A protein has these predicted regions:
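Functionally important transmembrane alpha-helices
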Residues: 167-168, 218
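Short acidic, glycine/serine/threonine-rich helix-capping segments at coil-helix boundaries
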Residues: 116-123, 190-225
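Short alpha-helix capping/helix-loop boundary micro-motifs
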Residues: 136-146
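Short, basic/aromatic beta-hairpin or loop at an interaction surface
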Residues: 111-137
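N-terminal capping segments
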Residues: 1-117, 160-163, 169-195
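Loop/turn positions that initiate beta-strands
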Residues: 150-154
């Protein structure tokens, strides 16, 4: 069975802003099957399973509430509407708006992580999630390039400015909470074909800057397979 994800995607006109408040076509804030993002995914898993469950639960409720739509210019109106309700978005009854990262911020707040800044966006999401101490970053193609090992409540965010989603169902080989691995620094180990990790990603980034063509691997942190 396909792994499902939920997110705030785009307004009813296929634009980032300017539509009517609230859900207009059942696709502005909605679920879909997991997909491999062209910009690549970074993966964050809550260390506490109950936090992960509440992140997923909030996203599901947002996707089902037709009072919640998409608009980058009004991205904080959902947060303001949900805050007095304990961030239970199922109780929001006035039409409001959010965007992908603002909605993840609301989901984290519902799970008890309320210190994320209003400026929380895909570009700074990794550093902000890491600062909370509540998440483990899962690296390598095992987590970033397939859905098999993903779990309900995982947060996926593009490696450059773009999009973020929350995983709503477990992959077939979901392992539960995973300890944070210490990445190898470039030069600490010999990189070989078939290797993966953050040091591989750094090597690929440096090769790209030098003009090398990496083909299908790009900067996925995967040295072939």
């Amino acid at each position: 069975m396909a792994v499902k994800v939920g997110s705030a995607r785009i307004d009813e006109n296929g634009k980032a802003h300017g539509g009517q408040a609230g859900e207009q076509n059942s696709r502005e804030v909605s679920t879909q099957n997991w997909y491999l993002q062209s910009k690549g995914w970074s993966v964050y898993r809550a260390k506490n399973p109950s936090v992960a469950e509440n992140i997923a639960k909030c996203m599901e409720r947002a996707c089902k509430n037709d009072k919640i739509g998409y608009d980058q210019y009004q991205r904080h109106t959902l947060y303001k509407a949900a805050e007095p309700l304990g961030f239970d978005v199922s109780k929001v009854t006035k039409a409001c708006e959010t965007d992908c990262s603002a909605l993840v911020r609301v989901c984290c707040a519902y799970a008890g992580i309320t210190g994320l800044p209003e400026s929380f966006r895909t570009g700074n999401m990794p550093s902000n999630l890491n600062k909370t101490g509540a998440f483990t970053e899962l690296t390598g193609s095992k987590y970033q390039s397939q859905s098999t090992y993903l779990g309900r409540g995982d947060i996926l965010v593009t490696k450059t400015n773009g999009h973020t989603v929350v995983v709503l169902s477990n992959g077939s080989k979901y392992e539960g909470t995973v300890a944070q691995s210490t990445p190898d620094a470039l030069g600490d180990r010999i990189l070989k074909y078939g290797g993966e990790g953050e040091d591989v990603t750094l090597m690929q980034e440096l090769l790209l800057k030098l003009g090398y063509d990496l083909g299908s691997w790009v900067c996925a942190g995967d040295f072939g397979d």
